[in-house]
């Protein structure tokens, strides 16, 4: 019987889907739903959110380059949409940078984990 944690399995695709849904809720919540927090916490949330998207995307089998490109476009698009009347929040270059750092950290974490697992499998 195969492990439910194997790469490209149903569990990995489900985790990616949940991560995307959570990101939509976090990034596009109306201003009244965004809790007050100490300075910098929003950047940490962005970083962790995009790191999670990167790790879950790699686990689901999305290629590194494709995933990085899509996530950076998603980050930029989300910031642009936040500045519209549709969402009513402010666009932030700082949030975009935190998103990109999160993508890079997530991809790096996945590469380290996958490399270690390949080494122990031999």
Regions found by a protein language model. Give the residues of each.
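Bulky hydrophobic segments
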Residues: 1-96, 100, 104-122
């Amino acid at each position: 019987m195969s492990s439910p944690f194997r790469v490209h399995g149903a569990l990995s695709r489900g985790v990616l889907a949940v991560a995307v849904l959570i990101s939509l809720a976090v990034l596009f919540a109306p201003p009244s739903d965004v809790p007050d927090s100490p300075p910098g916490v929003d950047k940490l949330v962005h970083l962790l959110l995009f790191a999670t998207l990167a790790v879950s995307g790699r686990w689901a089998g999305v290629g590194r380059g494709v995933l990085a490109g899509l996530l950076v476009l998603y980050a930029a698009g989300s910031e642009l949409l936040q500045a519209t009347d549709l969402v009513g929040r402010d666009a932030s270059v700082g949030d975009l940078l935190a998103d990109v750092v999160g993508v890079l950290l997530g991809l790096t974490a996945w590469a380290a984990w996958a490399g270690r697992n390949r080494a122990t499998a031999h």
